[in-house]
Amino acid sequence: MKKISLLGATGSIGWQTYDILKEQREAFQLVAFSSGKNMEKTREMIDNLKPELVSVQLEEDALLLAKEYPTIHFTFGAQGLVEVATHPASTVLVNAVLGSVGLESTLAAIRMGKTIAIANKETLVTAGHLVMAEAKKYNATILPVDSEHSAIFQSMNGENPKDIERLIITASGGSFRDKTRDQLKHVTVADALNHPNWSMGAKITIDSATMMNKGLEVIEAHVLFDMPYEKIDVLLHRESIIHSLVEYHDTSVIAQLGTPDMRVPIQYALSYPDRIPLHNGQRLNLAQIGQLHFQEMDFERYPALRLAYEAGRTGGTILTAMNAANEAAVAAFLQGKITFLQIDETIERVMQAHQNIAIPDLQTILQVDSETRKIVLDMVK
């Protein structure tokens, strides 16, 4: 039985991980988890899976829960995330927290040689060089949870990376894929949150609509698979059935297919190198689907993807600045402070003004992250 620590338990990926853990009790045991402010979901997880350690966002919630559950240890805040990540009993850490807050706790778990199932794009985007160097140093395994990177990982299994011609990451196009840039001037938050294929959290659904999500995934693929940017392509694929493809020198293309269900890559990262049956999984019926559609990526239609490639090729702290600007701009859009098209514009303005540091340490990354968010807050007032 594998013992699991979970960061970001009450978010979209975390809750789907919980769904797997409660159905696969013979395979996995949850020993520690972190949650935010959702006490209803936190209590449900405690009641169902009885972990040893729980971290919440606020101290008052931790004190309240400690009275209700005297046999469980409760902690809170940023230090609580590190405690969950480094729980001595767990061998696998699922990092499903949103944004760059998962960085320090992930590095702490890596230094203990744990297997990291990483669903937190921002950790790899802002500090990929640190994460992979530390993983190599401490012999920690990094497994992708994103459906696209899981697909690439599976399509590379048993192959020599030197034989790869290119990685092809598929993109649904998001909630506005049939709209022109001109039509996007007046879209609402509710419009943007209506994703055609996937059930995801608000931030990633907006990122999907701007295509920044795919940009982050391109950078993530570069980091995880040590692949140059000129060998990473993005292909529009409306149905989200082919999750990604790997093309080899001999023109062979290996792809991973399946119905759009995030539990599949989550469970694969947990059970790897084994596969176990998925509870209530929907089997793929290609005859029923009938047709799959593909289009070349339009970088003018999706400037956020162009910006992500630019930041990736430049490297250094511009990756942190781009990511922090995006997170802050998306939050401003969700709060009704800026329009949808101003998300891209805000990111570009931040990137143009940024003074890049080529090989940043952790402290520099965190400082740039914090400063960039303040800059965007001032811009959107």
Swiss-Prot record:
Matches recorded under InterPro entries: DXP_reductoisomerase (IPR003821), DXP_reductoisomerase_C (IPR013644), DXP_reductoisomerase_N (IPR013512), DXPR_C (IPR026877), DXPR_C_sf (IPR036169), NAD(P)-bd_dom_sf (IPR036291)
Top enzyme class: oxidoreductase
Superkingdom: Bacteria
Catalyzed reactions per annotation: 2-C-methyl-D-erythritol 4-phosphate + NADP(+) = 1-deoxy-D-xylulose 5-phosphate + NADPH + H(+)
Pathway the protein takes part in: Isoprenoid biosynthesis; isopentenyl diphosphate biosynthesis via DXP pathway; isopentenyl diphosphate from 1-deoxy-D-xylulose 5-phosphate: step 1/6
Molecular-function annotations in GO: 1-deoxy-D-xylulose-5-phosphate reductoisomerase activity; manganese ion binding; NADPH binding
UniProt-listed GO biological process terms: isopentenyl diphosphate biosynthetic process, methylerythritol 4-phosphate pathway involved in terpenoid biosynthetic process
EC number: 1.1.1.267
Alphabetic keyword roster: Isoprene biosynthesis, Manganese, Metal-binding, NADP, Oxidoreductase
Keyword Nucleotide-binding annotated: no
Positions contributing to NADPH binding: T10, G11, S12, I13, G36, K37, N38, N120, E122, G201
Residues annotated as binding 1-deoxy-D-xylulose 5-phosphate: K121, S147, E148, S172, H195, S208, N213, K214, E217
Cofactors demanded by this protein: Mg(2+); Mn(2+)
Positions of Mn(2+) binding: D146, E148, E217
Family: Belongs to the DXR family.
Function: Catalyzes the NADPH-dependent rearrangement and reduction of 1-deoxy-D-xylulose-5-phosphate (DXP) to 2-C-methyl-D-erythritol 4-phosphate (MEP).
Protein known as: 1-deoxy-D-xylulose 5-phosphate reductoisomerase
Organism whose genome encodes this protein: Lysinibacillus sphaericus (strain C3-41)
